Amino acid sequence: RLFTATIQRCLGKEQIADLMEYQAEITKDSFIKTFWNGYYLDDYVDGDYHNAEVRPNQIIAASLPYSPLDRRQCKAVVDICTKELYTPKGLRTISPKSGGYRPEYIGGQLERDRNFHNGPVWPWTIAAYAIAYLKVYQHSGESFIRRLLTGYEAEMSELCIGTLNELYDGNPPFKGHGGMSYAPSVASVIEVCNTLA
């Protein structure tokens, strides 16, 4: 059930809870009709144009406790993100199969700005990925998620001592860039650890 409907039911407000559940179902249906392309979620929709580039935004929808996606759709999203976006440092911002893939965060400000959302890895995506992965694969996915955390060990003990960068190149050796001690990156790894605890 929708979180707010659950709260309303706890407060004894059944009519409000029913209305919220009804509205949530309409929203879910609209979300699926708009973004689900039969295989995974489109990145964005503009009128009749559906951008089907594989990007990590869709993992957030799959990770939500009250996701608009059913179990089969969540699995499809997790699987496409694993196949095309997953790296030892997190999820790439776009699939290497995309024509706009720019894995390195290098060059002048203009080039770095252009590349920022088109190939580098954002570690902050790893918490949503781990939560969605465990939602789909449950206990059988725990060993994979534990191994996922080892991708940060060298970074935290040798390079960015005790912390993580804002982003990493999308291809090996996954060199770190951007802000050091980037709070969303660190918080995401901590959230994964807490999820496994």
Regions picked out by a protein language model, each given a short descriptive name:
Residues 57-69, 78, 130-139, 145, ...:
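Alpha-helical support elements that line or immediately flank enzyme active sites
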Residues 55, 122-126, 145-146, 183-184:
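A structural signal for short secondary-structure junctions
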Residues 132, 136-139, 151-162, 167, ...:
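Hydrophobic alpha-helical segments
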Residues 104-141, 190-194:
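C-terminal substrate/ligand-recognition segments
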Residues 78, 82, 113, 130-131, ...:
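Generic hydrophobic alpha-helical scaffold/packing signal
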